[in-house]
């Protein structure tokens, strides 16, 4: 299920665009996640009270968390699948503390793809979308394996 060097290059090329505005991208990803899958909002005590898109857009906490999420994901993507050291603490916190099911990681992966398609259409064609989907699936599969090791049924 690994990615070729060419696929990793496509992933990292578009990720460079994300890094030019991590707070903006992170905010958009979380807003899309919460709009498309409102049940995910229940896992975020800081954001549960945000009901409208306008409230979400004006939330500094949401923007900060989006930055945290995409910064962590960027660090993992740059490892090109050799992300064990980065993944272990992330899996631990998401399993034991936050109780985030793997399904929600699928939902945020979808949100990431949709945001990249809307913001970077010219740099995120079918090949790049396919490569990013594979990279995010690899990440989710590895998180799921860690969850299993930790005894979390998410």
Curated annotation (Swiss-Prot):
Amino acids binding O2: 65
Subcellular location as annotated: Cytoplasm, Sarcoplasm
Catalytic activity: Fe(III)-heme b-[protein] + nitric oxide + H2O = Fe(II)-heme b-[protein] + nitrite + 2 H(+); H2O2 + AH2 = A + 2 H2O
Modified residues (Phosphothreonine): 68
GO molecular function: heme binding; metal ion binding; nitrite reductase activity; oxygen binding; oxygen carrier activity; peroxidase activity
Post-translational modification Phosphoserine, affected residues: 4
Residues binding nitrite: 65
Span of domain Globin: 2-148
A GO CC annotation given for this chain: extracellular exosome
Entry's Gene Ontology BP terms: removal of superoxide radicals
Keyword entries, A-Z: Cytoplasm, Heme, Iron, Metal-binding, Muscle protein, Oxidoreductase, Oxygen transport, Phosphoprotein, Transport
Residues annotated for heme b binding in this entry: 94
Pfam families: Globin (PF00042)
EC number: 1.7.-.-, 1.11.1.-
Annotated function: Monomeric heme protein which primary function is to store oxygen and facilitate its diffusion within muscle tissues. Reversibly binds oxygen through a pentacoordinated heme iron and enables its timely and efficient release as needed during periods of heightened demand. Depending on the oxidative conditions of tissues and cells, and in addition to its ability to bind oxygen, it also has a nitrite reductase activity whereby it regulates the production of bioactive nitric oxide.
Protein family membership: Belongs to the globin family.
Subunit structure: Monomeric.
Protein name: Myoglobin
């Amino acid at each position: 299920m690994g990615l070729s060097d060419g696929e990793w290059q496509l992933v990292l090329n578009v990720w460079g665009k994300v890094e030019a505005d991590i707070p903006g991208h992170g905010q958009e990803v979380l807003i899309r996640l919460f709009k498309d899958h409102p049940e995910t909002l229940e896992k975020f005590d800081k954001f549960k009270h945000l009901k409208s898109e306008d409230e979400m857009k004006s939330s500094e906490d949401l923007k900060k968390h989006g930055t945290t999420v995409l910064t962590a994901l960027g660090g993992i993507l740059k490892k090109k699948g050799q992300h064990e050291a980065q993944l272990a603490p992330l899996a631990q916190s998401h399993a034991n503390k936050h109780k985030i099911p793997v399904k929600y990681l699928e939902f945020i992966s979808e949100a990431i793809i949709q945001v990249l398609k809307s913001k970077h259409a010219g740099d995120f064609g079918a090949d790049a979308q396919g490569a990013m989907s594979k990279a995010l699936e690899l990440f989710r599969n590895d998180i799921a394996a860690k969850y299993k090791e930790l005894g979390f049924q998410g």
